[in-house]
Structure formats: C-alpha cells, structure tokens
Regions:
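Conserved small/polar residues in nucleotide/adenosyl-binding loops
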Residues: 164-169
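Alpha-helical transmembrane segments of multipass membrane proteins
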Residues: 17-21, 100, 126-127, 150
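Hydrophobic alpha-helical membrane segments of integral membrane proteins
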Residues: 8-11, 36, 87, 127-148, ...
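Transmembrane-helix signature of multi-pass solute transporters
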Residues: 46, 124-127
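Transmembrane alpha-helical core residues of multi-pass small-molecule transporters
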Residues: 12, 40-43, 95, 121, ...
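Transmembrane helix-loop-helix hairpins at membrane boundaries of multipass inner-membrane proteins
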Residues: 1-7, 19-116
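Alpha-helical transmembrane bundle and helix-membrane interface signal
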Residues: 104-111, 153-163
Length: 174
C-alpha cells in the first residue's frame, strides 16, 4: 500500500485549521467554523477507523511505516503504528469531534481560534502517537504544548478552576 495514511492523519487537522485561519471570524460565521472543524475531525476519525481495519493484528511489528530523510544522517521523518499506538490514535480522533460538539455555549469569545487550537493539538497528538524517530517525537510533543497552553491560558481561567475545586470539595464532604 503506497498511500501515506499516517501522514494524512497528521496533516488533515492542520489543513482544516489553515482553512479556519483564512476564513473570517464574524459572528454569523461561527456556526460555519464549527461545522468545518467538526467535518475535518470526523473525516480524520473515519480515516483512523479505516486504518484500524487495515491493521494486521497477527504481527507485533510496526505497520504503515513511512520513512523520509529530513536531515541526512541525523533526523528521519519516520512514522508507524503498532497495536498500542493505533488505539491512542483512534481515541484522539474520537475525542476531538466530541470536544468540538461540546463547545456550544462554553466558548463565547474567539471560537474560530479555539477550533484552530483544537485541530492543531489533534495534529500534534497524532504525530506523537505514531512517531518512530526520537527527534520527531520530541518536536511533536513539545509543539503540542503550545495549543494546549493557549487553550488553558485564553479559555480556561482561575474562576472556573475555583468553581471545579469547590464543587469537588462539596461532593467529597469537605
């Protein structure tokens, strides 16, 4: 099979994020942005399910390996999946549409940027789970912290953290 399915899984959310980046973020365009992000993440989910059906469970070797020379003799873009990483990829692509669906009223400002951050984070998470080169793993892992930091810093807050902790304390009988 010559189709680079893992690279497609990695790049598809980034393409959706680029599309959202170049669309205007007016109030009437928020629903369109959400549908574009949801469509992109659902296509990625079904692509990961397709990957699961193509996966040979009788072998423990890495499958769907793509190896490209990045810096000769130093770094290769090498991705592949085994029995554990494919489950994490499917889990990531399953949770992302749920996150996009669940932002109905919780994200009121900068919805477009929030959806871009979610899709970019999905890109980096899938890259982490299928990277076979240590440098590529490190780059995906560290780059994944950037959208996570933005999501927590912009849309998270001390007030909501305080509410969640006080609610947990009430439930525990403290």
């Amino acid at each position: 099979m010559n189709f680079p399915i893992l690279s497609s899984l990695i790049l598809l959310p980034s393409i959706g994020a680029l599309f959202l980046f170049f669309t205007k973020s007016k109030s009437e365009n928020k629903i369109t942005a959400k549908y574009v992000a949801l469509f992109t993440s659902l296509v990625n989910f079904f692509l990961s399910i397709y990957l699961w059906f193509l996966f040979d469970q009788t072998t423990s070797a890495f499958q769907f390996v793509e190896d490209r020379i990045w810096i000769k003799g130093l770094i290769n873009y090498k991705v592949g999946v085994d029995g554990i990483s494919i489950l994490f990829i499917i889990l990531t692509t399953f949770i992302t549409p749920l996150c996009i669906i669940s932002v109905n009223n919780s994200v009121t400002k900068r919805l477009n940027e929030f959806l871009i951050a979610i899709l970019v984070m999905e890109t980096f998470m899938i890259g982490v789970f299928c990277s076979l080169d240590l440098v590529v793993f490190y780059l995906f892992f560290e780059a994944g912290l950037i959208p996570m930091f933005l999501i927590i810093g912009i849309w998270g807050g001390a007030r909501s953290c305080l509410l969640y902790t006080s609610d947990a304390a009430d439930d525990s009988g403290c």
